[in-house]
């Protein structure tokens, strides 16, 4: 790694620690040329493969934006959305693959969203699962009632 101060092409790792609940590694480095220290953070890139085949990095912000639309007019605060996005990221990282289909991200959103707000869940599920009739909504509401009773 190049030193950000003198651009020397090498550096020595002084200390390494896990951070962000094990999702990243923070390294303290020292430049052998100028002697200055700097910090780097390394994370494994999780790629989402869209239906078109295009791959893009996983984005918590994108998850939050999509869920926020479903929560419009509901009493759901930003902290709850951030927690939901973290749960979704943990779930998709837990699959253990570097690339995940966008469909799997949608599935990972449904569970935590159902626990957060049932109306927002129905809104999100209706778009995600392409509801086309009132019967689709009725089936999903029955499934919600069964889940609540379990």
Curated annotation (Swiss-Prot):
- What name does UniProt use for this protein? Transcriptional repressor NrdR
What's this chain's function? Negatively regulates transcription of bacterial ribonucleotide reductase nrd genes and operons by binding to NrdR-boxes.
Which Pfam families did the record assign? ATP-cone (PF03477), Zn_ribbon_NrdR (PF22811)
Can you name the source organism? Mycolicibacterium smegmatis (strain ATCC 700084 / mc(2)155)
InterPro entries under this entry?
ATP-cone_dom, NrdR-like_N, RNR_NrdR-like
Ranges for domain ATP-cone come to 46-136
Q: Which family does it belong to?
A: Belongs to the NrdR family.
Its domain of life reads: Bacteria
State if Zinc-finger is listed as a keyword: yes
What is the cofactor note?
A: Binds 1 zinc ion.
ZnF (unnamed) residues: 3-34
Q: Name one GO biological process term.
A: negative regulation of DNA-templated transcription
Name its co-factor(s).
Zn(2+)
In terms of NCBIfam families, this protein maps to: transcriptional regulator NrdR
Q: Name one GO molecular function term.
A: ATP binding
The record's keywords, sorted A to Z, are: ATP-binding, DNA-binding, Metal-binding, Nucleotide-binding, Repressor, Transcription, Transcription regulation, Zinc, Zinc-finger
Q: Does the keyword Transmembrane helix apply?
A: no
